[in-house]
Amino acid sequence: MRTELTPIEARVIGCLIEKEVTTPDQYPLSLNALTNACNQKSNREPVMSLSESEVLDAVDQLISRRLVSDESGFNSRVSKYQHRFCNTEFGDLKLSAQEKGIVCCMLLRGPQTPGELRTRTNRLATFADVKEVETVLDKLASEERGQLVVKLPIEPGKRESRYMHQFCGEVDLDAFQGSALMTASSTAQFDDERVAHLEAEVEALKQELAELKSLVNSLL
């Protein structure tokens, strides 16, 4: 069964996974460090502005579901938190370093193309090329793995499909398809209107030119 998270819980888990790999000497994280990580302006989509209270509420919910643990030492004045989202002794979700990097990046930044994921996971995992990213995505998207990610319809004007995690609930592909079609329709309508406007301007210029020629001829 796939874990289902709220957007704030997804941000908390993503930050804990990220900092576990990129700043291991500062991990587990204090509430202040975790809040700062959640509100980072770089490598986050969308950018959030969460209070410590909001982050703590999410952490408490995750602790109750055994997805986060408080690793504070005895008599410690500051609580320190680490994720138990994957690769725990008794947990069901086991991810390779590459899978973990991709999932982390998606939790922090939402839908992304394989090319974007390869670039953005460079501190989390190593991929030889985009093809290797696609291979890992295919595994994560398989029914055997519980369809942890899903391939989205190609957006109008784009060459690559984006992939989205399903830890915040099952992705409505029909809604994405409808949105893409509406965008394409709006773009086509805008193009038609623009062409019609340009054609009208050309006709007006032709008319003005004809009038100027007529005026010049009358003066000769």
Swiss-Prot record:
Which regions span the lipid bilayer? none
Superkingdom as given in the UniProt entry: Bacteria
Among InterPro entries, the record links this protein to:
DUF480 (IPR007432), WH-like_DNA-bd_sf (IPR036388), WH_DNA-bd_sf (IPR036390)
- Return the PANTHER family for the record: UPF0502 PROTEIN YCEH (PTHR38768:SF1)
In the record, the note on similarity to other proteins reads: Belongs to the UPF0502 family.
HAMAP family named among the record's database cross-references: UPF0502 (MF_01584)
What name goes with this protein?
Answer: UPF0502 protein VVA1225
Organism whose genome encodes this protein: Vibrio vulnificus (strain YJ016)
